[in-house]
């Protein structure tokens, strides 16, 4: 199974990806996580450090693939999850899609691409050009991380459009949304009414999730010294179980931009008309 995790920049994709990878490994699967972001910090919570990128390694070998071995690019992280960082082109030059393609090409040449039960691509922020959705060319499922805010759902809608486009050429499906760092889900529910798709899980605002990222650890590793965090791991295990059940998924039909803007902003304005005493949180302004 190959998964591609997308979402608005800063929404918590890498933290979610690392914990989902561990959850899948906990279920007995051999997992490879590929960071597909020039920041090359996708696997930081699994390894505890910034591992060398494939692009760095290729450049150091003058792009002689035959001189590269699996141990040069694959690092084992917590829980036995293997980790690769694709890296990216220099700022303002090159294409992220090319980097993903080179990463996949190298892993295939090393006979490593097909050794895993699950390969998870953790992909950079928004879909704004043909290069960013490149991991969808290799994925069976796309997973979108969002929150209950306007901007994240607007980005999710663009990603949904990209899934629909890529599904024309191979059997790609959208597994669903994962709500992250949100105490409410009303805006998420409003969106999926207009663009039907599963909501696999909604994680509330949990400070320890943010802290885990800073510490370079997953929640699963933190539970070794603080068993009170076991309940947080259950969110990720639930997501893993749904993915391992090989859901049918959907080929989404995105909402037109202007229609979505009207839908979400009108909903926000209706909520904002209530008084603070009624417990309404202005999630739009918190994004």
From Swiss-Prot:
Gene3D superfamilies to which the protein is assigned, alphabetical: P-loop containing nucleotide triphosphate hydrolases (3.40.50.300)
Record pathway: Porphyrin-containing compound metabolism; chlorophyll biosynthesis (light-independent)
Main location class: plastid
Example GO biological process: photosynthesis, dark reaction
Record key words, sorted: 4Fe-4S, ATP-binding, Chlorophyll biosynthesis, Chloroplast, Iron, Iron-sulfur, Magnesium, Metal-binding, Nucleotide-binding, Oxidoreductase, Photosynthesis, Plastid
InterPro entries in the cross-refs: NifH/chlL_CS, NifH/frxC, P-loop_NTPase, Protochlorophyllide_ATP-bd
Catalysed reaction equations from the record: chlorophyllide a + oxidized 2[4Fe-4S]-[ferredoxin] + 2 ADP + 2 phosphate = protochlorophyllide a + reduced 2[4Fe-4S]-[ferredoxin] + 2 ATP + 2 H2O
Family matches, as CDD domains: Bchl-like
Ranges in coiled-coil conformation: none
GO molecular function term, any single one: oxidoreductase activity, acting on iron-sulfur proteins as donors
Enzyme Commission code: 1.3.7.7
Subunit (UniProt): Homodimer. Protochlorophyllide reductase is composed of three subunits; ChlL, ChlN and ChlB.
Protein name as annotated: Light-independent protochlorophyllide reductase iron-sulfur ATP-binding protein
Gene for this chain: chlL-A
């Amino acid at each position: 199974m190959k998964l591609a995790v997308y979402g608005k920049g800063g929404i918590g994709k890498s933290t979610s990806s690392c914990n989902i990878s561990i959850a899948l490994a906990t279920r007995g699967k051999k997992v490879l996580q590929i960071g597909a972001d020039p920041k090359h910090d996708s696997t930081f919570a699994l390894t505890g450090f910034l591992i060398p990128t494939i692009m760095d390694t290729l450049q150091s070998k003058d792009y002689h693939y035959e001189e590269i071995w699996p141990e040069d690019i694959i690092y084992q992280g917590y829980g036995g999850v293997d980790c690769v960082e694709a890296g990216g082109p220099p700022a303002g030059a090159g294409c992220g899609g090319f980097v993903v393609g080179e990463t996949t090409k190298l892993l295939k040449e090393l006979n490593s691409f097909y050794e895993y039960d699950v390969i998870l691509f953790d992909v950079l922020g928004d879909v704004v050009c043909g290069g960013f959705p490149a991991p969808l060319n290799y994925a069976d499922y796309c997973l979108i991380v969002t929150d209950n805010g306007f901007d994240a759902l607007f980005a999710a809608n663009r990603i949904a459009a990209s899934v629909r486009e890529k599904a024309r050429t191979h059997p790609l499906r959208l597994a669903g949304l994962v709500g992250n760092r949100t105490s409410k889900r009303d805006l998420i529910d409003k969106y999926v009414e207009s663009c039907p798709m599963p909501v696999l899980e909604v994680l509330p605002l949990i400070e320890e999730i943010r802290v885990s990222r800073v510490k370079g650890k997953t929640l699963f590793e933190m539970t070794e010294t603080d068993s009170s965090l076991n309940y947080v791991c259950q969110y990720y295990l639930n997501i893993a179980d749904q993915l391992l059940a090989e859901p049918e998924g959907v080929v989404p039909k995105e909402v037109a931009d202007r229609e979505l803007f009207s839908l979400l902003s009108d909903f926000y304005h209706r909520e904002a008309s209530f008084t603070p005493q009624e417990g309404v949180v202005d999630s739009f302004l918190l994004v």
